[in-house]
Amino acid sequence: MMREPLVSEEEEEEATEVLLVEKTKLCKRRGDEEKTEERRDDLLLLALTPMVRSKSQGTTRRVTPTPPPVDVEKPLPNGDLYMGTFSGGFPNGSGKYLWKDGCMYEGEWKRGKASGKGKFSWPSGATYEGEFKSGRMEGSGTFVGVDGDTYRGSWVADRKQGHGQKRYANGDYYEGTWRRNLQDGRGRYVWMNGNQYTGEWRNGVICGKGVLAWPNGNRYEGQWENGVPKGSGVFTWADGSSWIGSWNESSNLMRNFFDGIEKNELIVATRKRSSVDSGAGSLTGEKIFPRICIWESDGEAGDITCDIVDNVEASVIYRDRISIDKDGFRQFRKNPCCFSGEAKKPGETISKGHKKYDLMLNLQHGIRYSVGKHASVVRDLKQSDFDPSEKFWTRFPPEGSKTTPPHLSVDFRWKDYCPLVFRRLRELFTVDPADYMLAICGNDALRELSSPGKSGSFFYLTQDDRFMIKTVKKSEVKVLLRMLPSYYKHVCQYENTLVTRFYGVHCIKPVGGQKTRFIVMGNLFCSEYRIQRRFDLKGSSHGRYTSKPEGEIDETTTLKDLDLNFAFRLQRNWYQELMTQIKRDCEFLEAERIMDYSLLVGVHFRDDNTGDKMGLSPFVLRSGKIESYQSEKFMRGCRFLEAELQDMDRILAGRKPLIRLGANMPARAERMARRSDYDQYSSGGTNYQSHGEVYEVVLYFGIIDILQDYDISKKIEHAYKSLQADPASISAVDPKLYSRRFRDFISRIFIEDG
């Protein structure tokens, strides 16, 4: 028999409406769109039974006993679901709460709030398992982010606070003190390449006293501020030699060397991650030592914002040259020939009022949408992903839609071709999605370049020079989509391939306007070095020269086969690897019936004493003895050997080599007589007339324009031009002949340096 409640009907109705709310938020981590900040998400519980209160009547007090715990399963009006134990009108004990958006908490409850041990899961895949208190993450717990980052340690009010360990998805590791989700106090950070910092932190950055150690035995101990050395410090080499100095407000570090050397300076450069290789520094010291370079990066919330780079990688940031003074010491001075003033950037910045302004805005909206849409898709590629019909149209009305944001451009439609394949290619080429979007879709406008060729295509370059966007014809899109499976297989198989790196294929169609198809690809000449000469080389001679007078040729002029007056000497290993890779790439293009491609070559000329640019001789000698500096002569053999040894150090340390095939390659350019006769390219034309002038250079090169197949138009072009010139001298020839001629030409302009 049920006991009647000793309360009035009005009080019972009031108790039925009791709502227990503990409401905080936890960001659902979604790629690079939101920063991680662990907070609780909509913890909303509704009491399922009336809460009974006692009532006094005069001196009489009647109390209803607390009913025993009961297991319930109750759908709530808002679509949520609670399953678990109730006691006294509250969730109390063990229970599970499911939100309609996919969030879930399972664990212990106390008077309607998550308290004790439990687990909270988000739809994104992120989880927290550990202790709760009054509905918040508090105590000891483990958070696993959707990208694989893992934090184990102490929590206070939904935030990392106290001692904790965090393992990052990229292999880095931090253990130490946290405050409000940031490293704060004393801690140790270990990079995946073996670099390690132990010391003090403040608000997520290195600040205070600490020690930075490299795997090769070098170490720096001293004061830091905002991620860079500031104040007194000591640098010690692995051989025991060391110096002590002080970093002052003018960013000069004066130091005393302990092995007979007087003064020098430590070089620290900073950069933002969104500005690719854009560091700058000033070098005013008297001797050369390994440099410490700290790169700022826009890390995730709670992550450190600096990355450590050693010797060779740091050296490419600086634009100064070494000369020998009268005492036999090297000093850094500005190179008046190569670095007087800012480098001229090609192209016209697209600003409001430019005729391509709307097209640029549409392109940026589309790229941002495409990268974000497919970021959460995690699966292996299927054969259907390569299907040329695998394309998606999306409308972008100015007022916005359910899937697109409002914008200030015209109404347009956006087409994405094989998006999952190109996302995988970007990963393969180590292009970070955030960097990709920031470079193309950030606040900086694109620069428009007119086509240097006859295609009429337009090129758009990002302000950081990393990515190039080219408008293409429908036929070129068809060729790329047709060869996409073979292209994907080729670049996966050969890491050092020289063929163009493609990052995406898209199409824009404004309402009532024409379609514009374009391809996003890597910029071959993205470098801290100024490219002072560039050549587009096909191996043909008919019409292969620039129409500009000699006096008008500058750094932005693209020269052609008949303008080439250099032969490039490579160290034996690089020469053999180049010939092997050229053969592989040409065989791939020949199999795909591709012709009319070019080898684009960029040349940076170095003075004899600019070894600092490549991080060569100045950084090899560690003894600090004056005799070593005086005896080192920058012999070319030593340059190649040092480059190889330091590159091997980088590989063993887990970092990508600075020098790779087609990028940052040290070479010697030997001046030859200008080639005005195609016969000199033939098998009998190897006896070039040398001028005896040899230059130390840095080379960049790759195979471009690989989307032209040998179709009917090219066959007609071949027949027509054959009436006017030697058929072997024209560009439009059968792919098999083109490949053989191209390889033969490359083997003649690149020479093994004995």
Swiss-Prot record:
SMART domains found in the cross-reference section: MORN (SM00698), PIPKc (SM00330)
GO molecular function: 1-phosphatidylinositol-3-phosphate 5-kinase activity; 1-phosphatidylinositol-4-phosphate 5-kinase activity; ATP binding
Major place of residence: membrane
Known EC number: 2.7.1.68
Protein name: Phosphatidylinositol 4-phosphate 5-kinase 2
Subcellular location: Cell membrane
Keywords recorded for this protein, A-Z: ATP-binding, Cell membrane, Kinase, Membrane, Nucleotide-binding, Repeat, Transferase
UniProt activity-regulation remark: Activated by binding to RABE1D.
Lineage: Eukaryota, Viridiplantae, Streptophyta, Embryophyta, Tracheophyta
Species whose genome carries this gene: Arabidopsis thaliana (Mouse-ear cress)
Subunit record text: Interacts with RABE1A, TUFA, RABE1C, RABE1D and RABE1E.
Class in the EC hierarchy, top level: transferase
Physiological role: Possesses phosphatidylinositol (PtdIns) phosphate kinase activity. Phosphorylates PtdIns(4)P and PtdIns(3)P in vitro. Doesn't phosphorylate PtdIns(5)P nor PtdIns(3,4)P2 in vitro. Does not exhibit phosphatidylinositol kinase activity in vitro.
Pfam family for this entry, one: MORN
Domain (PIPK): residue spans on this chain: 351-750
Region (Disordered): 54-77
Record GO cellular component, one term: plasma membrane
Placement of MORN repeats on the sequence: 82-104, 105-127, 128-150, 151-173, 174-196, 197-219, 220-242
